[in-house]
Regions:
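An alpha-helical repeat/solenoid feature that recognizes helix-turn-helix modules
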Residues: 1-7, 25-57, 71-106, 120-157, ...
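Extended, well-ordered alpha-helical scaffold segments
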Residues: 4-26, 50-72, 99-118, 151-170, ...
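Intrinsic disorder/low-structure terminal segments
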Residues: 5, 21, 46, 96, ...
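Hydrophilic extracytoplasmic domains
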Residues: 163-181, 187, 197-218, 229-230
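Intrinsically disordered, low-complexity repeat and linker tracts
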Residues: 205-274
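Juxtamembrane interface at the cytosolic side of transmembrane helices
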Residues: 279-280
Length: 280
């Protein structure tokens, strides 16, 4: 799926027009939920050859990220510091961690804060101020954070097991529960838990982080721009080696046409661009 031609709509172009009107202040606090700054960075970075003034936009996003951090180094300020905010925002910026000292400093400092919210049973609380109870959302976000940014003081396998063992719905349908109600929660708890789990599993498999869609966008563009080989109109002089085919009965089963996992990931890549576009 090509986000530059999604059902005839160039989603990237529309996003381009919006993001180029935003100031650093708009990005960090006023016009956009700070939780979305990571997905915006991911999209601009992936489409940097398409989006106007992309270097400036990326620099502004980085400035907005740093401006959104509290002066005490506890990480993202969204009505105060929390495990959830650090885990929701910072993993999107993993590509800058090894190359940008300011981002690395902010991440490492936030890690010192977030690891304090990990409880003895492996679950995580909302914040240092409100460390209990360990809950699904905060546990998922802490797993996403520490799976992406390895920390010697944090055993991510323990965090993962605590989510699966304590918060997975007993019905076995892949849902996770709201810690406070005990009910399945598809709006918040399940997405947060799965975000942590997916990030963790990606790191175990040695894959790039799931928020970096750069390679997928490039693959889509390369496939779109690949020259189409015209079939030859010359008659073949070679004898056919193909066996004779039986007449179709109409009951044949079509062979697999591709890797479903790859297709779904490319679909998610396009959706990432669409999501960022419509939520800013």
């Amino acid at each position: 799926i090509d986000a530059t031609d999604f059902n005839g709509i160039n989603v990237v172009s529309k996003f381009d027009k919006i993001i180029n009107t935003f100031s650093v202040d708009d990005l960090s606090n006023n016009s956009m939920n700070i939780y979305h700054i990571g997905s915006v960075y991911s999209v601009v970075n992936a489409y940097r050859d398409t989006i106007s003034n992309s270097d400036k936009v990326l620099a502004d996003i980085k400035s907005a990220l740093l401006a959104a951090c509290t002066a005490d180094g506890n990480g993202i300020d969204n009505w105060g510091n929390s495990t959830d905010s650090n885990g929701f925002v910072f993993p999107f910026f993993a590509s800058l961690y090894d190359t940008d000292s300011d981002v690395k400093k902010a991440v490492d400092s936030a890690a010192d804060y977030s690891k304090q919210t990990i409880l003895t049973d492996g679950t995580s609380g909302y914040s240092v101020q409100y460390p209990t109870p360990g809950n699904t959302n905060s546990s998922g976000m802490n797993l996403a954070f520490f799976a992406q940014y390895n920390n010697p003081d944090v055993n991510t396998a323990v965090l993962y097991n605590s989510i699966v063992n304590k918060f997975k719905s007993a019905s076995g349908n892949g849902a996770y529960i709201n810690t406070y109600t005990g009910q399945e929660d598809f709006k918040s708890a399940t997405p947060d838990a799965l975000q942590g789990i997916i990030t963790y599993l990606y790191t175990l498999e040695g894959k790039t982080n799931p928020f970096d869609i750069t390679a997928d966008v490039k693959a889509i563009a390369d496939a779109k721009n690949a020259p189409v080989e015209e079939p030859s109109t010359e008659p073949s002089t070679e004898p056919s080696t193909e066996p004779a085919t039986e007449p179709s009965t109409g009951n044949e089963v079509s062979p697999a046409t591709g890797d479903v996992n790859v297709y779904m990931y490319l679909l998610l890549a396009a959706c990432a661009a669409t999501f960022a576009c419509v939520t800013v």
